[in-house]
Amino acid sequence: MTTQTAQAGGPAPVTPTGCCPPFDPVPYEDQEVTWDHKRFVKERVHSFFHVPLDMGRKVTHAMRLIEAAHEKAAHNLMLSDERSPFRSDLYIDVDGPVPGAEMVEISGTFLTRVYEGPFRDAPKWCEDMTRHVAAKGRTLKKLYLGYTTCPACAKAYGTNYVVVFAEVEPLT
């Protein structure tokens, strides 16, 4: 299998592009996080068999609104929820309300793993994460793909990290 989880120790130092900051996978690898009403701007992305058709336009639109509101979060977290082969919902993490944007809050418990490779490997990453959740004895509710950089920055940095967030039933 060519897809693998990110190696411990994080990426080698790189020169920032000025677009997306370099991503350190270590804080996201094999973690459990709980969100309580975490705020996101939501955009709907049209796809053709899971290939996004208007993602760049949607991200640009959302980022303009977020930057105008001065609510850009430090984490630069962008989650994708593949609703169907023809539509996904994109969630961009923000610090506060963004006028003119659809706002949502996400709450829950999530297990995370970091993967590196081309986006076409996403189905393999999701299968691996599903097995990982089961191996931990947890019940999977939903998967989100967390994009860490745009395609141009992934190419410039030589890595394409994706964090898979598995929403799980909380332990009782």
What are these regions (language model features)?
Residues 1-172:
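A solvent-exposed interaction/effector surface
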